[in-house]
Amino acid sequence: MLSPKRTKFRKAHKGRIHGLAKSGTQLNFGAFGLKALEPERITARQIEASRRAITRAMKRAGRVWIRIFPDTPVSTKPAEVRMGSGKGNPEYWAARVKPGRILFEIEGVPPEVAKLALSLGAAKLPIKTKFVQRIGDA
């Protein structure tokens, strides 16, 4: 699973995800992509599950690019622990995703296979997404 090798700080504020994505909104590598339509934190496990679904549907042909990286530590407190007494320990890593962000890109497969693969990958994610393709690749 994806996670940073090292970070400046162990824990991060929860924060909110406002506005639209400024960068990472265009297809840069592949011919087809999956674009986020909602703001959400996507965990490293969800990214990996989606990647596996996409590569399986493509029958190992073509190439997949992951355009998001889980760089935010998410901390939780254990079950049945009283409020207070500090912030919990980091449990997993998540990527903050804004609407308009390209999540995955693929190439080297026909458009029908690409659409099927990305829809199977989208089913593993907690947000609404949209299939996009490069203009001229019909």
From Swiss-Prot:
Example GO molecular function: structural constituent of ribosome
Assigned GO CC terms: cytosolic large ribosomal subunit
Any Pfam family matching the protein: Ribosomal_L16
Keyword set includes Disulfide bond: no
InterPro entries linked to this entry: Ribosomal_uL16, Ribosomal_uL16_bact-type, Ribosomal_uL16_CS, Ribosomal_uL16_dom, Ribosomal_uL16_sf
Signal peptide boundaries: none
Highest taxon, organism lineage: Bacteria
Gene3D superfamilies assigned: Ribosomal protein L10e/L16
Keywords, alphabetical: Ribonucleoprotein, Ribosomal protein, RNA-binding, rRNA-binding, tRNA-binding
Keyword Ribonucleoprotein: yes
GO biological process, one term: translation
Family the entry assigns: Belongs to the universal ribosomal protein uL16 family.
NCBIfam families cross-referenced by the UniProt entry: rplP_bact
Cross-referenced PANTHER family: 50S/60S RIBOSOMAL PROTEIN L16 (PTHR12220), LARGE RIBOSOMAL SUBUNIT PROTEIN UL16M (PTHR12220:SF13)
Record note on quaternary structure: Part of the 50S ribosomal subunit.
Function: Binds 23S rRNA and is also seen to make contacts with the A and possibly P site tRNAs.
Protein name: Large ribosomal subunit protein uL16
Organism of provenance: Gluconobacter oxydans (strain 621H) (Gluconobacter suboxydans)
Lineage: Bacteria, Pseudomonadati, Pseudomonadota, Alphaproteobacteria, Acetobacterales
Gene: rplP
